[in-house]
A protein has these predicted regions:
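Non-heme Fe(II)/2-oxoglutarate
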Residues: 2-11, 55, 191, 198, ...
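A short beta-loop-beta micro-motif enriched in histidine and acidic residues
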Residues: 125-137, 179-180, 186, 209-210
Length: 255
């Protein structure tokens, strides 16, 4: 199995993204893909996340990261077949191929910004700046609620992935607003792919309900994963997935 074969088997064709979509991803660093999940799929995922949050309790998210003011879950690859779409959807994988070339899933997590919480400083999802075009990581936000200005929609600085700097290099306080920032709003079921070198951050949830999303994070194949999929893959998960999905996860068997 190789990248081209895996993507072909998962339905990724050369025209899975339009020229305009590729241009927007290159220029702005983000691309909304509407209607990726149906209302039924969104409802089923939210139900499963609520179940997992209740079962895991204080340990929820520990496999990767816990964050004050949020409900987080990690290692979702192993926790329900509903989550397979996040590393198998042709449009999303086509966007990852456009940004990264040869890639793998780094982690699949959920994040719910709780009421009165969720504000983050602007940051990039990488440890250091990279030269424009030499991108190493790319993320996708799977909207499980409508993202609005009131409930903590993600803010980004369009084009900042091409600056070759980090927010702290140019801002006295990355928690402040940036004059060029915009909010990524959209309907539940939308997926927003964004170059992880793009400056971004959550905003304050000023409603009385959590703002829920999945994050499917991808990286170049030579990089370590945020969660070592090979070390965590369960037998039942491995057995239900296809060889192409195994390749996207970079797993070759079970331990």
């Amino acid at each position: 199995m190789d990248m081209a074969t895996a993507l072909r088997d998962l339905g990724v064709s050369d025209d899975v993204l339009s020229s305009a979509e590729k241009e927007q991803l290159d220029r702005d660093g983000y691309l909304p893909l509407e209607g990726i999940l149906s209302a039924e799929e969104v409802s089923g995922i939210n139900k499963r996340l609520a179940e997992l949050t209740a079962v895991e309790g204080d340990r929820a998210g520990l496999e990767v990261h816990q964050e004050k003011g949020t409900d987080r879950l990690a290692d979702l690859v192993n926790k329900d077949a509903r989550f397979e779409v996040c590393f198998s959807h042709p449009r999303v994988l086509g966007a990852m191929r456009h940004v990264l070339g040869e890639f793998k899933l780094s982690s699949l997590n959920s994040r719910a910004a709780l009421p009165g919480e969720g504000h983050q400083g602007l940051h990039a999802d990488f440890s250091h700046p990279v030269e424009p075009g030499a991108y190493e990581v790319c993320n996708s936000i799977w909207l499980l609620d409508d993202f609005t200005p009131e409930n903590g929609a993600t803010r980004v600085v369009p084009g900042s992935h091409r600056r070759g700097t980090m927010p702290g290099d140019e801002m006295a306080n990355p928690a402040d607003d940036h004059p060029d920032q915009i909010l990524l709003t959209g309907k539940a079921g939308t997926v927003i792919v964004f170059n992880s070198h793009l400056w971004h951050g959550g905003t304050l949830n000023r409603t009385n309900t959590p703002r829920r999303a999945l994050h499917a994070y991808f990286a170049l194949r030579h990089l370590p994963q945020q969660l070592d999929q090979q070390a965590h893959i369960r037998v039942q998960t491995y057995n239900r997935l296809t060889p192409a999905q195994h390749f996207i996860l970079a797993v070759t068997g079970t331990n």
